């Protein structure tokens, strides 16, 4: 199962998921000026980030909206980036957050698990109902693919719906998490986690500890580190013996070069340093908790 590959990679390289949410404005100006087209510029930047962080990153999350916004050239760069990740024998997450049903969802599954946009995992939004998930499951079963399903996110508006309580005083996101966990039992890896993972925004330790205990078989994709206030201490609560989740950092890694004078000349090196720092911060906290 694909989740076993991710689990083993986390054991070897740590918990960092490098977010390739690559806006043109993130790319050094001198680099933008030296390229005639958007496709080559974006891809060269991404390739350098991947090469520089390969030994310290568990996986790469590519947010499709940043590429769609750039039209056909952007989507070509998106496709090239996913293929390059595969060529480097690394794991990719296509951050597409699809949430449709029936034939439309089947086409989304085909688009992102086959052909030009093929990835190892995709992110999905189940809040229209769990029939949004069903068309992807044959790929999980037969094609060694995985899902990260939105359970509880870290944005401010998450409380508008996800935190609504039922008559039994159970929050909606807990119900969604329980359903993901139950469905995931059919797609378990040898590592003890399912190839049906969950997107679990990092908020605070107490809640993380509760969720980790409730959702024992769910491997977490954890946004919210750094820019949204999550700390290594918070994140460690969502892990079990240092595994069971990957922590996404996008701008923090992509824009690390801006912290240094003339950093634009070594943006790949700066990205690697930030990736290693995040990895080591999380590892240190996890080791202290397990010692």
UniProtKB/Swiss-Prot annotation:
Q: Which reaction does it catalyse?
A: orotidine 5'-phosphate + H(+) = UMP + CO2
Ordered alphabetically, the record's keywords are: Decarboxylase, Lyase, Pyrimidine biosynthesis
Q: What class of enzyme is it?
A: lyase
Q: Tell me the route in metabolism or biology where this protein functions.
A: Pyrimidine metabolism; UMP biosynthesis via de novo pathway; UMP from orotate: step 2/2
Q: Output the InterPro entries linked to this UniProt entry.
A: Aldolase_TIM, OMPdecase_type-2, OMPdeCOase_dom, RibuloseP-bd_barrel
Task: Provide the GO biological process annotations.
Answer: 'de novo' pyrimidine nucleobase biosynthetic process; 'de novo' UMP biosynthetic process
Q: Name one Pfam family in it.
A: OMPdecase
Q: Name one GO molecular function term.
A: orotidine-5'-phosphate decarboxylase activity
| Active site, UniProt feature | 97
Q: Which residues form a coiled coil?
A: none
Its Enzyme Commission number? Answer: 4.1.1.23
Looking up PANTHER family in the UniProt record yields: OROTIDINE 5'-PHOSPHATE DECARBOXYLASE (PTHR43375:SF1)
The record's comment on protein family reads: Belongs to the OMP decarboxylase family. Type 2 subfamily.
The identity of this protein, by name, is: Orotidine 5'-phosphate decarboxylase
Could you tell me which species this protein originates from? Answer: Clostridium kluyveri (strain ATCC 8527 / DSM 555 / NBRC 12016 / NCIMB 10680 / K1)
């Amino acid at each position: 199962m694909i989740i076993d590959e991710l689990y083993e990679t986390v054991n070897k390289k740590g918990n960092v998921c490098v977010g390739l949410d690559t806006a043109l404005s993130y790319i050094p100006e001198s680099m933008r000026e030296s390229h005639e087209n958007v496709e080559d510029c974006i891809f060269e930047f991404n390739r350098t980030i991947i090469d520089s962080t390969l030994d310290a990153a568990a996986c790469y999350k590519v947010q499709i909206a940043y590429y769609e916004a750039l039209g056909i050239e952007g989507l070509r760069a998106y496709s090239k980036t996913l293929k390059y990740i595969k060529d480097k024998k690394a794991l990719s997450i296509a951050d597409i957050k699809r949430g449709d049903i029936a034939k439309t969802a089947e086409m989304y599954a085909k688009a992102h698990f086959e052909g030009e946009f093929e990835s190892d995992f995709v992110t999905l939004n189940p809040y229209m109902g769990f029939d949004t998930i069903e068309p992807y499951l044959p790929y999980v079963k037969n094609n060694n693919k995985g899902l990260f399903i939105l359970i509880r996110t870290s944005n401010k508006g998450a409380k508008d719906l996800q935190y609504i309580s039922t008559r039994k005083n159970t929050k909606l996101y807990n119900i969604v998490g329980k359903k993901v966990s139950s469905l995931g039992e059919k797609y378990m890896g040898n590592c003890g986690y399912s190839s049906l993972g969950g997107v679990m925004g990092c908020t605070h330790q107490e809640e993380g500890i509760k969720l980790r205990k409730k959702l024992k078989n769910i491997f977490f994709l954890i946004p919210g580190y750094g820019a949204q206030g999550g700390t290594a201490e918070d994140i460690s609560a969502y892990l079990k013996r240092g595994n069971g989740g990957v922590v996404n950092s996008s701008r923090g890694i992509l824009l690390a070069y801006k912290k240094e004078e003339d950093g634009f000349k070594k943006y790949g090196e700066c990205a690697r340093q930030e990736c290693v720092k995040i990895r080591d911060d999380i590892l240190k906290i996890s080791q202290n908790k397990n010692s």
